[in-house]
Amino acid sequence: MAALHTLWMGLVLLGVLGVLQTQAQVQVSLQPNFQQDKFLGRWFTSGLASNSSWFREKKKVLSMCVSVVAPSADGGLNLTSTFLRKEQCETRTLLLRPAGTPGCYSYTSPHWGSTHDVWVAMTDYDEYALLYTTGTKGLGQDFHMATLYSRTQTPRAEIKEKFTTFAKTQGFTEDAIVFLPQTDKCMEEHK
């Protein structure tokens, strides 16, 4: 009986530790007093970090893309991104639905059908924004990504360093962080 009690207590403790560990993984600070109206407009995706196998395979061929953030009818955001894919410009729009605290959104992945959460962790609205995205991709594969948005195609070195520090704080290693090269292709789509 004592062995059964000890086993049960061990399982309970493992469960509690598992819950605590899961909660700790998603603790991303949000931009204090996030102002959605100031976040609207044109952004360049200048930096990425991800644990995704797709990202690791493709990161050397990725290039900067342009995104436009506009208000949606439900109080969320329409995020329309145009990027180069197979030598052609491709445009995709995501509906970011408000998910509680201002600066926190969720969207459904058109490819996987899964729900992803997006946090605007830090922004000055005029120069840069740091975002963190998490979700499940495919069969139980956790997906995490940090993104650097810049209002220009040439973010300052201090902004790049801020992004690197942010990405490492989220658990990404140096080799999982990439600054996307500029391209003239597909950049005129959202002027």
Swiss-Prot record:
EC numbers for this chain: 5.3.99.2
Name of the protein this chain belongs to: Prostaglandin-H2 D-isomerase
SUBUNIT field: Monomer.
Record keyword Ubl conjugation present: no
Signal sequence segment: 1-24
Organism expressing this protein natively: Ursus arctos
Cystine pairings recorded for this chain: C89-C186
GO BP, sorted A to Z: mast cell degranulation; prostaglandin biosynthetic process; regulation of circadian sleep/wake cycle, sleep
